[in-house]
Amino acid sequence: TDLLHENPNGSSNLYFSFSEFAYFDIYILKREGADKDWDAFGKRLNRDILGEVAELKKTMTADDDRKLVENIIVKTQGFVSGNIKEDEERPVELFRELLLLYKGVTKEQLRENMKYFLSAIMPTCEEYGMFMCVHPDDPPFPILGLPRIVTCDEDIDWFLHAVDNPHNGLTFCAGSLSAGGHNDIIKLANKYAERTWFVHMRSCHIFPNGDFTEASHLGGRADLIELARIFEKVNPNLPMRVDHGMTMLGDENRGYN
């Protein structure tokens, strides 16, 4: 919800606020059933998210709404899929239309689609020596009425066994996985290192209320030093990159983050 959250030390990073995202979902996107979804999700977090949203609504301005749309739809979707451009005049309406494409799609259907796709491309991967690596859902929990299928140990285990071929592997994104309090990052790394073909070295810190932010390379829930040891031991030639993290001292203009 905030792509340039300011930290006390002067750096900035990504910050995910459940109340702000729920406000966006309910009052800006106006998604059908959003209030019920967030009420249920709040109970899982032991938070009154609908109450927080009601209080937030009292202070949100038109400019605040515009910034949320810019962060959640324009910049994020433009980066991930390219479906929404920076100069899009009706980003909210277009985003609604894109979400409708998945209306009624269940987790089981998404899993079967994934299995179908991976099974279909394995012969080509084997022929040309290519290794596919699935990136975990980010964030690793259902949002916007969409099911998620790569969020935890059980999900990873499922897709690796559904298409049990060494060319079907995992992108171990420590940042995405560590944003979920249900994930033990070191345990996952040890379990799936042999089927991991790419590593994103990033760490998230989860606050007591469930909100999360990107942490420094020595902080957060993902022990990046231990992760490097685990993957280097199993596969010394495994591609790893630090991924985006805290922006400081002009990094933003150089593309480091």
Tell where the protein language model's regions lie, with residue ranges:
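Histidine-acidic metal/acid-base catalytic patches
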Residues: 5-6, 25-44, 48-64, 71, ...
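Helix-loop segments that flank and shape redox-cofactor active sites
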Residues: 138
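Solvent-exposed N-terminal domain segments of exported/luminal and surface proteins
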Residues: 5-27
